[in-house]
């Protein structure tokens, strides 16, 4: 069975896609959101990041050639966005999670002024 034929993988990818759409739909509204809306938006980002981290781990553990290609494309995309080509993606995910924690702290401290 191909990696992408798995019901679990397909469901994860569908959920990632839905979360991405929700995040992108509201990203430009973020500056005008109130405190609770901002916290909800950051929560969506956290869920998206967790799902992406899990999918990346699954891709990394798979022997499926298509999964390996997708993993390589993710690394290529990260490099095109300015990350060094030898970046450890798990470190990238961890750093992104820390950034989201900082955002939540800022929202709590400053209300809606983030």
Model regions and ranges:
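Amphipathic alpha-helical binding modules
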Residues: 72-114
């Amino acid at each position: 069975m191909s990696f992408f034929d798995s019901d679990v993988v397909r469901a994860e990818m569908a959920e990632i896609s839905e979360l991405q759409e929700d995040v992108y739909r509201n990203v430009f509204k973020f500056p005008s959101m109130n405190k609770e809306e901002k916290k909800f938006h950051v929560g969506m980002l956290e869920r998206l990041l967790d799902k992406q981290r899990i999918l990346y781990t699954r891709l990394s553990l798979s022997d499926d050639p298509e999964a390996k290609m997708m993993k390589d494309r993710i690394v290529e995309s990260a490099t095109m966005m300015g990350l060094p080509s030898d970046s450890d993606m798990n470190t990238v995910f961890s750093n992104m999670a820390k950034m989201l924690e900082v955002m939540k702290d800022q929202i709590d401290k400053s209300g809606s002024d983030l």
